[in-house]
UniProtKB/Swiss-Prot annotation:
This is NAD-dependent malic enzyme. One of its GO terms (cellular component) is cytosol. GO terms for molecular function: malate dehydrogenase (decarboxylating) (NAD+) activity; metal ion binding; NAD binding; oxaloacetate decarboxylase activity. The gene is maeA. It comes from Shewanella baltica (strain OS195). Homotetramer. The lineage of its organism: Bacteria, Pseudomonadati, Pseudomonadota, Gammaproteobacteria, Alteromonadales. It catalyses: (S)-malate + NAD(+) = pyruvate + CO2 + NADH; oxaloacetate + H(+) = pyruvate + CO2. Keywords: Metal-binding, NAD, Oxidoreductase. HAMAP family: NAD_malic_enz. CDD domains: NAD_bind_1_malic_enz. The keyword Metal-binding applies.
């Protein structure tokens, strides 16, 4: 029987039910439920359906004049009635996703302490490092299957937001549910409060976190270790997603734990998976293969290098050598093109640095080889921006790229919109509508010479909910590179432009449930093939995906005792 049709037995009654967001129905409690649970008089007389409630809530949502107020309003619904919240978001996914997540969530993080209203998730502060087990036991969610955790040091492109970074795990888990069908009862946002180096927060009397410079070194590593061990003891089968850790910590944490626990880093691996999926779709639309592309990156941090490594892996899977693939990828950061003779390159950058011998025939470049120098000499067919600095994809650079590439693939992926390397409008006008464009944040369609171009949002929300659903449905013990590659290929298979030759590069958000299920199956199937879970047939895996997919419907309630 469908869980939504099965009654839920509750051992308590009265106002406590109305204060529990996972079970509160508000005005939708039936007459029988109002009597048996002592709710008569606590809600208005009319008994409403969830659609009637959602209609009222949508009218209220539309009455707000700015996105931050809309975000606060939706968060208030989430904190009082989660089923209604997810029905409302599901009904209006394209309109509300930019409100509950990027770009609005960035502003919500900056103003987290000022706008704080009600607790959600767990804050684990360094002074409480010896009581992590107790803190986990205090969680209102007892059967946790997915955790999103941050330390708030690198929130989107906004930098150190301290505990204000909690807005990101809350938002990400909202998308796990609204896009991937993960029951909100199984999700837990966590912020690791290890201090902040943001002077504005340290001096702000309203700041609610630990007022202390960030810890680092061994202290930080030991704190992360204690947290990971405690989570594994409390919820041994939980998927942990690392979110918005600083570059200096993100990759080391991932490398330390990816083979010990079921975990992944969305900024590195999720971003890479959706970028590769989008590139595969763009290549198919352009009638070419990824291993034939020459790719230039602006931004050589952990996210950019993570995407580059995923691209190299996909190129190798298409038949070229690892060495050849790396010659086709150029990484540019603030110091110019990464070269193998540069000092102080980070370990994950060293593998992607170009050999000096590869550029000995280049001409007309400066001491620090700029992106324009790379475009003029390497003649890339793909340009990816993950710099977090607006405006760096200049008209000169885009026109130079278009001069040697009829259909350039250009992905300015930096978030939020204020940090984008170039707007889709500019890119499409500079290329006479020929560029294949995807962005990290949402943009309105662009009209060039009377033709309308829908802008694909190369957003991780197309990937991580499906990965989470696939891990839960299959029971995978780890998230392997092959599972991530499978998610990229599955996303590309859903591209309207690649399938039909028209429409957007990526599916519409209204189709996100079907996309997430398709990705979940691909991810789960690889987990089974790699022996990361118990053997199961394709049919059983598909049934498990459907069985784990939660829908925002009210359940009937029964009393367990009087």
């Amino acid at each position: 029987m469908d869980d939504n049709k099965r009654p839920l037995y509750l051992p308590f009654a009265g106002p406590a039910i109305l204060e529990a967001p996972l079970i509160n129905k508000g005005s939708a409690f039936s007459e029988e439920e109002r009597i048996f649970f002592n709710l008569e008089g606590l809600v208005p007389y009319a008994i409403e359906t969830i659609e009637e409630q959602a209609s009222r809530a949508y009218d209220q949502f539309r009455s707000f004049n700015n996105d931050l107020d809309k975000h606060i309003y939706l968060r208030n619904i989430q904190d009082t009635n989660e089923t209604l919240f997810y029905r409302l978001v599901q009904n209006n996914i394209s309109e509300m996703m930019p409100i509950i997540y990027t770009p609005t969530v960035g502003l919500a993080c900056e103003r987290f302490s000022k706008n704080y209203r009600r607790n959600r998730g767990l804050f684990i502060s360094y002074p409480n490092k010896d009581r992590i087990d107790d803190i986990l036991n205090n969680s209102t969610r007892q059967k946790v299957k997915i955790i999103v955790v941050t330390d708030g040091e690198r929130i989107l492109g906004l930098g150190d937001q301290g505990i204000g970074g909690m807005g990101i795990p809350i938002g990400k888990l909202s998308l796990y549910t609204s896009c991937g069908g993960i029951s909100p009862a199984y999700t837990l946002p966590i912020t690791l409060d290890v201090g902040t180096d943001n002077p504005q927060l340290l001096e702000d009397p309203m700041y609610m976190g630990w007022r202390h410079p960030r810890i680092g070194g061994e202290e930080y590593a030991e704190f992360i270790e204690a947290f990971m061990q405690a989570v594994h003891v409390r919820w041994p089968d939980t998927l942990i997603q690392f979110e918005d850790f600083a570059q200096k910590n993100a990759m080391p944490i991932l490398e330390r734990y990816k083979d010990r626990y079921c975990c992944f880093n969305d900024d590195i691996q999720g971003t890479a998976a959706v970028a590769v999926g989008s590139l595969l779709a763009a290549c198919k639309a352009a009638g070419t293969e990824l291993n034939q592309q020459r790719i230039a990156f602006l931004g050589a941090g952990s996210a950019g290098c993570g995407i580059a490594e995923a691209i190299v892996a996909q190129m190798v899977s298409e038949g070229i050598s690892d060495e050849q693939a790396r010659t086709q990828v150029c990484m540019v950061d603030r110091w110019g093109l990464l070269l193998d003779n540069m000092p102080n390159l980070l370990p994950f950058q060293q593998k992607l640095a170009q050999k000096c011998t590869n550029i000995q025939n280049w001409s007309n470049f400066s001491d620090n080889i700029s992106l324009l120098d790379v475009v003029n000499n390497a003649k890339p067919t793909v340009l990816i921006g993950v710099s977090g600095v607006p405006g760096l994809f200049t008209e000169e650079i885009i026109r130079a790229m278009h001069s040697h590439c009829a259909r350039p693939i250009i992905f300015p992926l930096s978030n939020p919109t204020s940090r984008v390397e170039a707007t889709p409008k500019d890119i499409l006008h500079w290329t006479s509508g020929q560029a294949l464009v995807a962005t990290g944040s949402p943009f309105e369609p662009v009209v060039v010479d009377g033709e309308t171009y829908e802008i694909a949002q190369c957003n991780n929300s197309f990937i991580f909910p499906g990965i989470g659903l696939g891990v839960l449905a299959s029971g995978a013990r780890h998230v392997s590179d092959a599972m991530l590659m499978a998610s990229s290929r599955a996303l590309a298979e859903c591209s309207p432009l690649a399938i039909d030759g028209s429409g957007p590069l990526l599916p519409k958000l209204e189709d996100i449930h079907a996309v997430s299920k398709h990705i979940a199956f691909a991810v789960g199937k690889v987990a089974v093939e790699q022996g990361l879970t118990l053997p199961m047939s394709d049919e059983i895996l598909q049934q498990s995906i459907e069985g784990n997919f939660w829908s925002p419907e009210y359940r009937r309630y029964k009393r367990t005792s009087f």
